[in-house]
């Protein structure tokens, strides 16, 4: 974890770094790319919130905020249905409250975020646009649209098998992934078994949580080991998935698997850098579900003794993937 440090100065006791690039990182301000964010209402009601003033609600139970306040010391997703219902409600309210362009810009400003990966357009220059597949279209039309999106500036592909109701092992997913994989562009997907709607919701059957199971992502990586694939949330938010993901990566010798830090504490972030490699870890928050501030603090704590590695995780690794 301290690869870049070459020793300590004879008189100063300060870390000594080998290259001018490494020295320069010590002198510059913190650079941050948030590799996992959302703008607008991503759920089935699709409320028109992006260009409206930020909404505010009376205080409500918010497990996302509680988790951040506790420094991500436990899993986000539990098997307790009552707790899951509270989480689902909070996720919808946070989307409406913090998912507008105005609220997003405020969060970027307050947390000094240089860029954030999201699905939308270039109206905010700090938002780096990814696109997603329109699985309603026939495969040839879907692929043609994705190619047009790339020409218009899409820097990668985002998949959400639960909310899109299409597993990662579906032929339509393969077709979309191949468009980006063959061009060397990154492909990220939600991973994790979690409900987005409470029991009885008319939308719950349209968002099967089992499509977030890790084995779907592992099958996709095995099919396309040469593509840049990024399992979000380090495989999931139940607390154990990142270890299973890392075991598979090492067992098969997959060289192009990256992952992100969303909802992970400093200890787990250090583990992720060791398990996947310091060049394969991307800072991410899953904003607006996380408020950014505590995620930044956790990442700073994780790599406080290695500013070069901190810059890689916060900025450099993502910048290389996105050709910035």
Where are these regions (language model features)?
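Mid-to-C-terminal alpha-helical segments outside catalytic/metal-binding sites
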Residues: 4-35, 42-95, 99-106, 115, ...
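Active-site gating/metal-coordination segments in enzymes
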Residues: 15, 19, 23, 114-200
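Conserved, mostly hydrophobic/aromatic
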Residues: 36, 108, 157, 180, ...
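Histidine-centered divalent metal-coordination motifs
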Residues: 36-42, 190, 233
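Short aromatic-enriched loop/helix-cap "lid" or pocket-rim segments at secondary-structure transitions
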Residues: 43-49, 142-143, 199-202, 241-244, ...
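Acidic-and-aromatic substrate-binding clefts and catalytic sites of carbohydrate-active enzymes
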Residues: 94-98, 135-141, 163-171, 237-240, ...
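A structural motif corresponding to the C-terminal end of an alpha-helix
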Residues: 106-116, 123, 219-229
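Catalytic pocket-lining loop regions of alpha/beta-barrel enzymes
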Residues: 155-156, 169-282
């Amino acid at each position: 974890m301290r690869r870049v440090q070459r020793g300590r100065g004879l008189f100063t006791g300060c870390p000594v770094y080998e290259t001018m690039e490494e020295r320069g990182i010590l002198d510059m301000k913190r650079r941050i790319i948030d590799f996992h964010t959302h703008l607008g209402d991503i759920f089935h009601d699709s409320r028109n919130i992006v260009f409206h003033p930020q909404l505010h609600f009376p205080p409500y139970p918010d497990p996302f905020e509680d988790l951040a306040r506790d420094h991500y010391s436990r899993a986000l997703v539990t098997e307790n249905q009552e707790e899951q219902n509270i989480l689902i409600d909070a996720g919808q309210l946070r989307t409406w409250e913090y998912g507008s362009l105005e609220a997003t810009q405020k969060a970027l400003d307050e947390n000094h975020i240089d860029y954030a990966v999201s699905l939308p357009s270039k109206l905010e220059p700090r938002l780096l646009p990814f696109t997603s597949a329109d699985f309603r279209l026939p495969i040839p039309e879907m692929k043609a649209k994705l190619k047009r999106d790339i020409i218009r500036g899409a820097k990668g592909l985002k998949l959400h098998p639960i909310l899109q109701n299409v597993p990662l092992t579906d032929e339509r997913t393969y077709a979309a992934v191949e468009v980006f994989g063959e061009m060397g562009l990154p492909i990220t997907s939600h991973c994790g078994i979690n409900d987005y709607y409470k029991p009885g919701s008319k939308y719950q059957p349209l968002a099967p949580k089992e499509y977030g199971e890790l084995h779907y992502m592992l099958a996709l990586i095995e099919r396309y080991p040469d593509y840049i694939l990024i399992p979000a949330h380090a495989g999931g938010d139940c607390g154990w998935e990142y270890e299973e993901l890392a075991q598979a990566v090492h067992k098969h010798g997959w060289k192009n698997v990256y992952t992100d830090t969303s909802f992970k504490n400093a200890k787990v972030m250090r583990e992720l850098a060791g398990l996947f490699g310091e060049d394969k870890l991307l800072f991410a928050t899953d904003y607006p579900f996380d408020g950014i501030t505590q995620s930044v603090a956790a990442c700073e704590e994780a790599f406080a003794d290695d500013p070069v590695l901190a810059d890689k995780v916060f900025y450099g690794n993502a910048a290389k993937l996105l050709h910035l």
